């Protein structure tokens, strides 16, 4: 193969399969939509990162009634192969040689997003554990940068207070300094990346948070618990 590291996978012999079918000239079966095969390589990467066992174990623990890992795979593959909205990504299910999802409700894609958000920190730790073990990740330099996303909504999110006026939760979509100079509510997002260019973690902040005020809380929440050795932070 062109990529030497793929040799172990190319040398594996698979059982021969025989297919027999008959078509007539002019039959709709003569025309087919191209099918995607490249996700087979990405499947292996997800397995090496331990995401297949992570989602499977949590599905059993939480007794989810839908294929949360199937939806997650579809979202990941779609983002890499053919980026689209979440709903349109689900509709790409039939574009794969073997559909990712079998019997499913498309609306469960939004439940999957909730699951990923609720377990973000656990997912990041699982990925990092396997990158340290299998790819020997031990960054000497960690890079950090901040960007933001704007939302086409009329008003920013309101903060939530208790009966005594104490702040319970701060709204995320706030008016701030938009990178695209739009006068719309934004959300700040900080990204950590290792010296190999591989993302480590992300963290979001209310849109009116200044960039330099995001580093310390993001570092404490996402990096301090990953047991990295000494490193230089470039922000």
Task: Name the predicted role of every residue range.
Residues 176-180:
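Conserved beta-alpha junction segments in alpha/beta enzyme cores
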Residues 203-225:
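Active-site beta-loop-alpha junctions of metal-dependent nucleic acid enzymes
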Residues 95, 115, 220-228:
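Conserved helix-loop functional segments at active or binding sites
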Residues 228-235:
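Phosphate/diphosphate-binding loops
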Residues 1-169, 183, 189-208:
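Dynamic "connector" segments at or just before major functional cores
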Residues 69, 214, 235:
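Short, glycine/acidic-rich beta->alpha junctions
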Residues 169-175:
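Short Pro/Gly-enriched beta-strand edge/turn motifs at strand-loop
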